[in-house]
Amino acid sequence: MKIKRSFISISVLMVIFGLMISVQFNSLKHPKVRDTRDMWDIREELTSEQKKQEKLLAEINKYDKLLNSYSQTKEMTKETALNNTLQSLKKTAGMTDITGSGIVITISPLFSESLTGEPIENPPPDLLKKLINELNSYGAEHISINERRVVNHTVIRDINGTTKIDGYALDDYPLTVKVLAKDPDMLHSRVKGSGLEDLFASENLALKAGKSESKLTLKAYDRPLDVQQLKLLKD
């Protein structure tokens, strides 16, 4: 399809060349009549025609360079497209570091152990999953919890009484959740207007969200991807 488009573009350029040359040729043709103009008129017309010729040559040179650039980049088009696609997929899959605007959410104990008389528990996995789902529905594009990137196959679960994200323990408060979004203001408003704070408070956890004044950087997902279910497509 791209080769066809390039061919069409070149054809259009050639048509432009033909029209320009035709117009220039017609402008130089004059009927054979007796010239009654004085020398200054002739010189003025000659200068005008020379300028037209120079302009035409400049246009031809410009399109010639354009055609050369097409021929030079045509062979690189497939490789460039594949590379761009690969980088886009890596970005979407969370395999690259990413920097952008967003909000920061902190999760910490609401009341101390001395006040409740009970030990501080890890955040329940289901509660963190609920938070992630809500953030995604509010327009979150990228999320990390304690610098661990959240991707489609991230696993958050309780292992022997400790909440872990992809095998990393979340037992040290406060937890820091970084969230990137196209519209951080709207995301912040949605979080503040939701029932997330009350939901976390029911587990003796304080959830506080604030818009970051500086750019946030989320580290890439650093664990191997499970590709066992992927199959090679046959032609």
Curated annotation (Swiss-Prot):
<keyword id="KW-1003">Cell membrane</keyword>
<keyword id="KW-0472">Membrane</keyword>
<keyword id="KW-0812">Transmembrane</keyword>
<dbReference type="InterPro" id="IPR010273">
    <property type="entry name" value="DUF881"/>
</dbReference>
<protein>
    <recommendedName>
        <fullName>UPF0749 protein YlxX</fullName>
    </recommendedName>
</protein>
<dbReference type="Pfam" id="PF05949">
    <property type="entry name" value="DUF881"/>
</dbReference>
<comment type="similarity">
    <text>Belongs to the UPF0749 family.</text>
</comment>
<dbReference type="GO" id="GO:0005886">
    <property type="term" value="C:plasma membrane"/>
</dbReference>
<feature type="transmembrane region" description="Helical">
    <location>
        <begin position="6"/>
        <end position="26"/>
    </location>
</feature>
<keyword id="KW-1133">Transmembrane helix</keyword>
